[in-house]
Amino acid sequence: MKISLIIKIVEGGIRPQVNQTMINIQNILKKHNATMDDVVKCTCILANGDDWGTMSEEYVKFFKSHKPARTTFGGAELGDGILVEIECIANIK
Protein backbone atom coordinates (compact mmCIF):
# COMPACT_ATOMS: atom_id res chain seq x y z
CA MET A 1 0.00 0.00 0.00
CA LYS A 2 1.41 3.39 -0.93
CA ILE A 3 0.23 6.62 0.60
CA SER A 4 1.51 9.61 -1.32
CA LEU A 5 -1.05 12.37 -0.70
CA ILE A 6 0.36 15.12 1.49
CA ILE A 7 -2.43 17.05 3.16
CA LYS A 8 -0.38 19.29 5.45
CA ILE A 9 3.29 19.50 6.35
CA VAL A 10 3.73 19.48 10.12
CA GLU A 11 5.62 22.50 11.39
CA GLY A 12 8.04 22.60 14.30
CA GLY A 13 10.96 20.55 13.06
CA ILE A 14 11.96 16.92 12.82
CA ARG A 15 10.43 15.67 16.09
CA PRO A 16 6.79 16.61 15.34
CA GLN A 17 7.16 15.43 11.73
CA VAL A 18 8.40 12.00 12.83
CA ASN A 19 5.67 11.78 15.47
CA GLN A 20 2.90 12.61 12.99
CA THR A 21 4.33 10.28 10.35
CA MET A 22 4.37 7.39 12.83
CA ILE A 23 0.81 8.19 13.96
CA ASN A 24 -0.25 8.12 10.29
CA ILE A 25 1.40 4.71 9.89
CA GLN A 26 -0.38 3.42 13.02
CA ASN A 27 -3.71 4.65 11.66
CA ILE A 28 -3.18 2.98 8.29
CA LEU A 29 -2.25 -0.29 9.99
CA LYS A 30 -5.30 -0.07 12.25
CA LYS A 31 -7.57 0.23 9.19
CA HIS A 32 -6.18 -3.14 8.11
CA ASN A 33 -6.53 -4.78 11.55
CA ALA A 34 -2.79 -4.59 12.14
CA THR A 35 -0.51 -2.89 14.67
CA MET A 36 3.06 -1.70 14.87
CA ASP A 37 3.90 -5.25 16.05
CA ASP A 38 3.19 -6.38 12.47
CA VAL A 39 5.85 -4.07 11.00
CA VAL A 40 8.87 -6.04 9.78
CA LYS A 41 10.99 -3.30 8.14
CA CYS A 42 11.10 0.50 7.97
CA THR A 43 13.13 2.82 5.80
CA CYS A 44 13.61 6.31 7.24
CA ILE A 45 14.76 9.03 4.87
CA LEU A 46 15.93 12.32 6.33
CA ALA A 47 16.47 15.63 4.59
CA ASN A 48 19.35 16.25 7.01
CA GLY A 49 21.43 13.36 8.31
CA ASP A 50 22.19 15.38 11.45
CA ASP A 51 18.57 14.75 12.52
CA TRP A 52 19.21 11.01 12.94
CA GLY A 53 19.39 11.08 16.75
CA THR A 54 16.23 13.11 17.21
CA MET A 55 14.38 11.04 14.61
CA SER A 56 15.44 7.82 16.33
CA GLU A 57 14.32 9.04 19.77
CA GLU A 58 10.82 9.71 18.45
CA TYR A 59 10.65 6.63 16.21
CA VAL A 60 11.45 4.09 18.96
CA LYS A 61 8.52 5.34 21.08
CA PHE A 62 6.19 3.59 18.64
CA PHE A 63 7.74 0.15 19.08
CA LYS A 64 7.64 -1.52 22.49
CA SER A 65 9.38 -4.91 22.70
CA HIS A 66 9.20 -5.49 18.94
CA LYS A 67 11.99 -3.77 16.98
CA PRO A 68 11.64 -4.16 13.19
CA ALA A 69 14.62 -3.97 10.86
CA ARG A 70 15.41 -0.38 9.93
CA THR A 71 17.46 1.49 7.36
CA THR A 72 18.01 5.22 7.84
CA PHE A 73 19.82 7.65 5.59
CA GLY A 74 20.04 11.40 5.25
CA GLY A 75 20.80 14.06 2.72
CA ALA A 76 17.72 13.46 0.59
CA GLU A 77 15.73 16.15 -1.19
CA LEU A 78 12.23 15.42 0.05
CA GLY A 79 10.42 18.59 -0.93
CA ASP A 80 9.82 22.01 0.52
CA GLY A 81 9.50 21.72 4.29
CA ILE A 82 9.50 17.92 4.40
CA LEU A 83 12.17 16.71 6.83
CA VAL A 84 11.40 12.99 6.99
CA GLU A 85 9.82 10.19 5.00
CA ILE A 86 9.18 6.81 6.62
CA GLU A 87 8.21 3.73 4.66
CA CYS A 88 7.15 0.61 6.58
CA ILE A 89 6.51 -2.93 5.45
CA ALA A 90 4.08 -4.92 7.58
CA ASN A 91 3.07 -8.57 7.59
CA ILE A 92 -0.71 -8.24 7.54
CA LYS A 93 -2.67 -11.47 7.82
Locate each region found by the language model.
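Short, polar/acidic, helix-capping and beta-turn segments at strand->helix junctions
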Residues: M1-K93
